[in-house]
Structures are given as structure tokens and as C-alpha cells.
Curated annotation (Swiss-Prot):
Its main location: membrane. The gene is Slc38a11. Residues 1-34 are annotated as: Disordered. GO terms for cellular component: membrane. It comes from the Eukaryota. Putative sodium-dependent amino acid/proton antiporter. Residues 12-32 have a biased composition (Basic and acidic residues). The lineage of its organism: Eukaryota, Metazoa, Chordata, Craniata, Vertebrata. Keywords: Amino-acid transport, Ion transport, Membrane, Sodium, Sodium transport, Transmembrane, Transmembrane helix, Transport. It comes from Rattus norvegicus (Rat). This is Putative sodium-coupled neutral amino acid transporter 11. GO terms for molecular function: active monoatomic ion transmembrane transporter activity; inorganic cation transmembrane transporter activity; L-amino acid transmembrane transporter activity; monoatomic cation transmembrane transporter activity; neutral L-amino acid transmembrane transporter activity; secondary active transmembrane transporter activity. It is a multi-pass membrane protein. Belongs to the amino acid/polyamine transporter 2 family.
Length: 453
């Protein structure tokens, strides 16, 4: 097994104009074609995967007013950089994120990008398993006649069973276009989950005391919050796959897909973040469903829907992880046997790691600042600045010049803060307001940590 220099194929060996109608993804591996609506659902599904559950937590970190502003800003940067990547692919005549960076910055850049592009979806797969185990274990505990202490409804058992029966078989698909209908189902379930969160904001929120300074404009952990938001919004690692699945893909068509996808995603994300934070303020956990009481049947239904949503999102991340390894070590092509073997190895590794980790918040933060920030802010802008022949005063170049240093600050400062100032995690604990004797509290002057002990 050794590194294979990526090769450009077919008509894309020539330089292309951004408006060129050639596909930027070769057809041998991703031959299926999808409509624009299916592509929109794939992008939305990738955005509102596991990351959305941590957005209320990002409001707690940044301060609610600043958090909302940052959420809109990250969504705008995401939209801009996704279009920028495809423009860069057209300018360089390349058909993947990896080959774009390879042609722009050579082998060192290619190796760095491949590492990041592998790490992000792989860590996302781990977070999906954590969420699946946490949410579905609480769902099965509510079934009549089920012993809450049974090993068969433990998070570890559920992670293993869901992997073997659901996520692994779905991840064996070769064609991402076939996931369009699955992504549509996942998006519908997300709307149901949003309805549950909104309902509980109205019915449960007034009964939970608000923490001190709940509505302060800004907090010191705002950079970590950007990491969580970046984790939620990033889908750059699979944008060439989705672009290549379009019928007659063009930059103009891709721009419409991205604008629609981000608009839908930001509406869902802002509403979810607002309602989640309004309900729990300073008590908000990295996994919002950890805040709700286990006896709440409506939330139990929401947990079930979210668990299914995450399971259906998992294969998209596995696609990218497998593609990176295929391009780096196998020259972009796998036999059927190697395809199955590699997929099983990736899924198994993610499963084993997820069995050892309980707390979702730190996973979201670190993946956001270490992987998502460079993939969203730094690399797309660096590639475009080097490839584009537009004047320095062109709006795209000016925006790219802003994105690059901002991404570097988020990456370095966010990592330092995540390590030196880790947030509390109350995984598996029932919150204080779930007990009848505590629900009457009206004035809280203690820290959330004291009250969840």
C-alpha cells in the first residue's frame, strides 16, 4: 500500500472555465445522476447531521446575541466557500477537493488536505455513533416491561447493533446519488425533531429557572462556539461528490443548489439553537437531548427520530472517508472486495472509538476547530487566491483574504481554549429540574455544574 499521485481524467486534464459544463467528478465511481432537489437534500442532510444538536450549546458558549450573529456569519462563509471550491476546481481542471489542492500546492498541500478531509468525516462518524447510543438507549428504556438496567438497551450494545444492521449496509453503496431519498427522509425527521424542541420551549421552558447572565451579549468561549458551528455547517469534504452527481453540473447550477441548501439549513439551525437555548440557558449540554427528562414521552419520540436521522446521515461521511483513502493509497479505484473490506474497516474503527467516548461536546469542539475551520475558511480561500487571475479588488478575492486569517485564528485559539478550558459534561445524569422537589426553584445563583451533580 503506497501513495498514488492523483491523476486527472478525461476532458478535465485541460484547463476549464468556471462556467464549463464538464462534471468535476469522474463517473466511474459515482456514476449515478441526481436532480437539483436531491442534491439539495444531500447537502442539507450533511449540514444538519450531528452538529445541529450542539448549536444551543454554542449559544451558551458565545452568549446568545453574539451566538446568533456568528451563526449567520458562519452560514454565509459556508455558502461562499462551497461555491469558491467548485470555481477553483473549474479553474484548475480538477475533479475533487484533493486533486484541487494537489495541483495548487503540490504534494505537501495534498497530504495536509487528505489528512483533514479524512479526520473530519471520521470524527463525525464517531459523533454519530455517540448520539445514536445516547438517544436510542433512552428511547428503549421507556418501552413497557423493559428493565432500564438491561445490557441489551445499553448505549454500547445499541451502537454495535445499529452499526451492523443499518450504518454499515448503507455505507456500502458506491453511488452517493442513491442516498438522495434517504437524505429526504432524514430532512423530514429533522423537521419533526425541530417541532419537538419548539413545543418543549413553550411547555417546559417557563418551568426551568434561567441562569445568571443568560442573555449577556458575549462570552469568552465565542471562538469555541465558532468551532461547534463550523462542525455543524461544514459539508466541503463531500461537495465535489454531490456536485458530480448533478445532471450536467455547472457552477451556476451548483450555486443555486448551495444557496437553497444553506438557506434551508440556516433557518432550521437558528430556530433549533434559539429554542434549545431559550429552554435551558446556562444548563444547556453539548447534546441537547441530555437536558430533557427521561420520563418525557414526546422527547422520547424526538430522540427516536434524531437517532434515525443520524443513522441515515452516517453513510455520507463514510463515503468521503473511503474516497480519501481510495485516492491516496489506491489511485482512485477499488475492486468490489476491497470496497467492502475498506468500508468495513472504517466503520469498525469508528465504532470502537465511539464505545470509549461519552461526552459529545468536546468531540464537536475539537473537530470544529481542528478540521472544519481549515476546510471551510483556510484551504478554499488559499486555493482561490493562488488560482484566480481576478484583480485584487475583486469581491471574491477580498472575501478570501478575510477568510484566511480568520480561519487561522479560529483554529489555533479554538484548540487552545478547548484544551485549557474544557466544558462540563453531564452524560447520563438526570437534570435537577426533572425531580418534582426542584421544579419550583425560581432564582438560581449557583453554577449549572453544582445543580446537576
Amino acid at each position: 500500500m503506497s501513495y498514488q499521485q492523483p491523476q486527472l481524467r478525461g476532458p478535465l486534464q485541460r484547463e476549464t472555465d468556471p462556467s464549463d459544463r464538464e462534471s468535476l467528478v469522474s463517473g466511474h465511481e459515482h456514476g449515478g445522476k441526481s436532480s437539483q432537489s436531491a442534491a439539495v437534500f444531500n447537502v442539507v442532510n450533511s449540514v444538519i447531521g450531528s452538529g445541529i444538536i450542539g448549536l444551543p450549546y454554542s449559544m451558551k458558549q458565545a452568549g446568545f446575541p453574539l451566538g446568533i450573529l456568528l451563526l449567520f456569519w458562519v452560514s454565509y462563509i459556508t455558502d461562499f466557500s462551497l461555491v469558491l471550491l467548485i470555481k477553483g476546481g473549474a479553474l484548475s481542471g480538477t475533479d475533487s477537493y484533493q486533486s484541487l489542492v494537489n495541483k495548487t500546492f503540490g504534494f505537501p498541500g495534498y497530504l495536509l488536505l487528505s489528512t483533514l478531509q479524512f479526520m473530519y468525516p471520521f470524527i463525525a462518524m464517531i459523533s454519530y455513533n455517540i448520539i445514536t447510543g445516547d438517544t436510542l438507549s433512552k428511547v428503549f428504556q421507556r418501552l413497557p416491561g423493559v428493565d432500564p438496567g438491561s445490557w441489551f438497551i445499553s448505549r454500547h450494545f445499541i451502537i454495535v447493533v445499529s452499526t451492523v444492521t443499518c450504518t454499515l449496509p448503507l455505507s456500502l453503496y458506491r453511488d452517493i446519488a442513491k442516498l438522495g431519498k434517504i437524505s429526504f427522509i432524514s430532512t423530514i425527521l429533522t423537521a419533526v425533531i425541530l417541532g419537538v424542541v419548539v413545543t418543549r420551549t413553550i411547555s417546559l421552558g417557563p418551568n426551568i429557572p434561567k441562569t445568571d447572565n443568560a442573555w449577556v451579549f458575549a462570552r469568552p468561549n465565542a471562538i469555541q462556539a465558532i468551532g461547534v458551528m463550523s462542525f455543524a455547517f461544514i459539508c466541503h469534504h463531500n461537495c465535489f461528490l454531490v456536485y458530480g452527481s448533478l445532471e450536467e453540473p455547472t457552477v451556476a447550477k451548483w450555486r443555486r443548489v448551495i444557496h437553497t441548501s444553506i438557506l434551508v439549513s440556516v433557518f432550521i439551525c437558528v430556530l433549533f439553537a434559539t429554542c434549545g437555548y431559550f429552554t435551558f440557558t446556562g444548563f444547556t449540554q453539548g447534546d441537547l437531548f441530555e437536558n430533557y427528562c427521561r420520563s418525557d414521552d414526546l422527547v422520547t419520540f424526538g430522540r427516536f427520530c434524531y437517532g434515525i436521522t443520524v443513522i441515515l446521515t452516517y453513510p455520507i461521511e463514510c463515503f468521503v472517508t473511503r474516497e480519501v483513502i481510495t485516492n491516496v493509497f489506491f489511485g482512485g479505484a477499488l475492486s468490489s472486495v476491497f470496497h467492502v473490506t475498506l468500508t468495513a474497516a472504517i466503520v469498525t474503527a469508528a465504532t470502537l472509538i465511539s464505545l470509549l467516548i461519552d461526552c459529545l461536546g468536546i468531540v464537536l469542539e475539537l473537530n470544529g476547530v481542528l478540521c472544519a475551520a481549515p476546510l471551510i475558511f483556510i484551504i478554499p480561500s488559499a486555493c482561490y487566491l493562488k488560482l484566480s487571475e481576478e484583480p485584487r479588488t475583486h469581491s471574491d478575492k477580498l472575501m478570501a483574504c478575510v477568510m484566511f486569517p480568520v480561519g487561522a485564528v479560529v483554529m489555533v485559539a479554538g484548540f487552545v481554549m478547548a484544551i485549557t478550558n474544557p466544558q462540563d459534561c453531564t452524560h447520563g445524569q438526570e437534570m435537577f429540574y426533572c425531580f418534582p422537589d426542584n421544579i419550583s426553584l425560581t432564582n438560581i445563583s449557583h453554577s449549572p455544574r453544582q445543580l446537576t451533580a
